Amino acid sequence: MGTYLKNYSDDEFSVAGEKPEVEFMDYQNDDTLQDYASEDGPVIVTVPFPFEDGKPKSVLVGETSTDTISIENTSSESVTLWSVRIFSSNPENSYVLSMMRPPLNDANEEAKQDFLGLTSVEDRSLLPGHTLTIWLSCMPKDIGLHTSIVHVDIGDEKIERVAFLLADDNISKALLSEEPYSRRRGQNKKFEPAPIVPGCRPTRQHAQGFKYKLPQFAIPAHIRELIESKQRPDVLSEELSMINYAQFFSTLLVMEELNLEEEMRAYDMEGVSMRRRGRNFLSLEVPGLAERRPSLVQGDFIVARYARNDSRPYQGFIHKVEADEIFLQFDNQFHLNHHDRNQYHVSFTYNRVNMRRLYKSIHEAEFLGPDILFPCQSPCRALKRWPFKPLNPHINTEQADAVAMILGCRGVPPYVIYGPPGTGKTMTIIEAILQLYTAKKKAHILICAASNTAADHVLEKLLLASYLIRPSDIFRLNAQSRQYEDVNSDFIRFCFFEDRVFKCPPLQALLQYKIVISTYMSSSLLLAEGIRRGHFTHIFLDEAGQASEPEAMVPLSGLCGRNTVVVLAGDPMQLGPVVYSKQAEKDGLGISYLQRLLFDFEPYETGNPNYVTKLVRNYRCHPAILELPSELFYGGELIACKEDEASPAYDCIGLPNKSFPVLFVGIQGCDEREGTNPSWFNRIEVSKVVSIIRNLTKGGTVSEADIGVITPYRQQVAKIKKALEAFEMPDLKVGSVEQFQGQEREVIIISTVRSTVKHNEFDKFFNLGFLSNYKRFNVAITRAKSLLVIVGNPHIITKDRHWDRLLRYCADNGSYQGCPLPPPESYSYSDETKYDEDQGGPAGWDYNQEATSYNCNQEATSYNCNQEPSDSGYRGDNDAKSAATNNRTKWSEELPEDENQPFNNAEADPEEEMPKQRVKEGAEQGDVQPNDQCSTNDDQVHDAYPAKYTFPPGWCDISGIPASGWD
């Protein structure tokens, strides 16, 4: 019950350290703070406010919470109690000692006035067998963790007790969960391979017959065995080259696919029942489905077996998804034999079509040659700037240079537009497309984007110049899996569909379009329909930094000819490819094609204008918002062109420094999970975020649509949305960093969630959240135009060098509010995340450019980029993340908690194409049977059951690598 420390002063043994100040005690990371060993001594001191289920007791702001400290003399002699006192409290003076019970919250004023609080109890004699009871009370004035350290000096002993309370308000209290977290276990049962009895697919899944079928690319058995045994294929130790290109990326894709299989197996269920729904359907309840754990949509299928024996597996297609239920259609005999009392073992699957497209793209990439894959091996080129008259009068010098170079390009190598946040990448692409369309009558242009949202955004911008483009020349290609209702009504006329189901038009119709807009994956439908290599004179890859190299090769490998001009636009310092296998990400799948070009090949690395243009003028952010990311990631080169003007939002939240609209609100909350949902939330931060939003929108000063909330965890998104429902704020967007990439808001509020070192180290090890991922950090803090507010625990934030820089940046400019700041020297940066200290993009960028004139605000101004590059930026994010080996197994059991784990994208906005949707996009097309009966397509059945994967002849034929090449 207590710990004795003899003849020590307070500061020599206190958990508060040398000063009587409570900075931050991480009770979630240190189980000993309230876990006192039994004492051999004569005096026993109880612990006030003991934890409840491992967490501090909750108390409402403004209400008094009390508990006792009992000091019992178990010896046969009297002992002298020198003092009992509060050594330290956080917030300061938030706790009170007393010899009398504090008045209840509903007590009258007289009782409250009669209460006598003490700073200490001194000089008392405690008789043998007697117990002294002292009251410790706290009435919180604000939400968050309240901590107190009490010292008991008795005889020649000193005993310390630490008290914790978590202060809630009505908002955070309403988000309390009564269901403790317990990890849901999936089935681990192994079944002998058996032919799957096919089910009946939904009507909308019957696709057109494509001219060219997609090969299966089944995973070779020996490669599966090698990777599943945790052995590293030799090819991954080789330097990437034309010779091993297909083998190298095929291996990485196999690693990725095996990871996807494993993740889906975690959701398998044993001994479950189904209910008959009407004549044709059986329904299955899937726990976590509402949170998309797993994420299932119409057209997916499950595999079911009777639980009573090792029976044949049956394929059941999903025809409808409702809350936690899926409606399934199996083989007719399965429905006839079904009884509601039957029990089944269920396995979830994912559709392999997009993975097969990726395999195909890298195997065919060899036809592109070194000009695309390894530009350093191609002859140097000298482009002639093509003279043109800007159609958009607002494009700047660098944007005009990029357009002139693109117009002057004659085929490969690719041209790169390196565009940091808010510098107008899309504007540059749109200008180039319009110039090509109007000046080059034979131009056929393909524009690919990383998501449906991004592709629609390109279409939207093109339509602003509709007076220049004939509507019949534009086509927006959609995957069949995309819901008709998700498409903006203004865009429907540019799409091709039948019965509200999107399709790819016939070849002759495709050939007539001058501008085709697609996602990376859907572009494969063009090849499947018969479009040949070289048809497109120009291929634009927008947001190329978000696409893995195999994804970038989907449009390039089959459609890019020798004379095709390829243009990549993106920023390698922002979000990279979505990769689920951490080993595959580390070995190269996490490096985008754009990043490889910029960092590995001298013409791009040195900023040669014949190969690359870097945009440096930011029109989005207030200069104070832009300054830190510019210094950290872009060598201080970015130029803020947004006018520095005060926003009415500044007064709404009491911004301390009106000329510095970056505010850090420090708060000590609590990391929590509930039920079987492994995603994290912090209800204290939710309340603070909602409070800030209410202040901003009070009186209509700031509209809901002008505010965005970024937070890394799905459950935090859900909790914030739930809290906002009470205040009727449907237009306010809350989402992950990925959902805000390419977007902006006048006001951005960031909720970091993490309040314990232990969970932050977990994120750091697996590169989750955004407290350990500098690319997510960069995107998060560059979405705001006028005001950026960060809500988080400063003691956790400071463990990462980037977030610590942001914290100190705010504090140094007098823009910090909340709990006490940690001193600058209190934490060293973790060595567990190793960063490359090369700064500001490609190492060869010349930051000492000569002064140039440019019209930022419609007036002639000048700027000078003669700034030294910072030494704290990074060239890549694929360095190995090391951590304590003994934590690896424990942590890996918790992996599905992250916002970006596969198939777990709950709360995503309907229009957003999240990672799972990337895997699924168009998954029903290119290899299905165009009939209306139950599918007997062996390819589909083959895909449904991983154990049937074989090594068919021709697996590597397309790349010229024989089967033995995998050894």
In which residue ranges do the predicted regions lie?
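Feature for long, exposed domains in two main contexts
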Residues: M1-E261
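ASCE P-loop NTPase motor cores of helicases and related translocases
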Residues: L116, F327-S518, Y634-G700, A705, ...
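Short, charged beta-turn/beta-strand-edge "cap" motif at the junction between a beta-strand
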Residues: C138-D142, A307-S311, S523, V753-R754
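Pre-ATPase regulatory/linker segments immediately N-terminal to the P-loop/RecA-like helicase/translocase core
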Residues: T147, H151, G155, L165-S283, ...
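Short basic/glycine-enriched coil/helix segment immediately N-terminal to the Walker B
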Residues: S295, P413, Q508-Q512, L525-T537
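Conserved helicase motor core of SF1/SF2 NTP-dependent helicases
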Residues: A439-K442, S451, M521-S524, G530-Q849, ...
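Asparagine/serine/threonine-enriched low-complexity, disordered tracts
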Residues: D846-N848, N855-N857, N864-N866, N886-N887, ...
